[in-house]
C-alpha cells in the first residue's frame, strides 16, 4: 500500500512538472489564452500532492519508508522531482515579474503617447521629444 501511495505521489509530481513546463511555454510565448486552464490544473495537482503528503508524513510511515530500500528510492525520486518543480516554478515567477514590468512600461508609453503633450516618433521609430505635434507653431 505504501508503495502504491508513493508511486501515486511521484505520478502527481511528474504531472505537476509537465504542467509547470506548459506554464513556462505560455509565459514565454505570451499565450495567455491557455494560461488560465494551466493554472487551474496546477492548483488541482498541488492540492493532490499536499493531501497525499499529509497521509505519508507521520513519523510511523516515514520509519517504514526508511526501512525499505525500494520505498526509500521512491521517496528520493519524489524529492528530486519536487526540487525540479520548485526550480521551474521559481523561473515562472520571474517570467511573470518581467512580464508585469514590460506591461507597466508599455502602459506608461501609451499614456505618454495619448497625453496632451504627445511625443512624436522619428523615421526610425525612436522617440522625438523635440516636437510636441506642432502645438507651439506660430506660423
Q: What are the residue ranges of the model-derived segments?
A:
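Extended, charge-rich alpha-helical scaffolding segments
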Residues: 1-77, 84-87
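Short terminal interaction segments
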Residues: 74-139
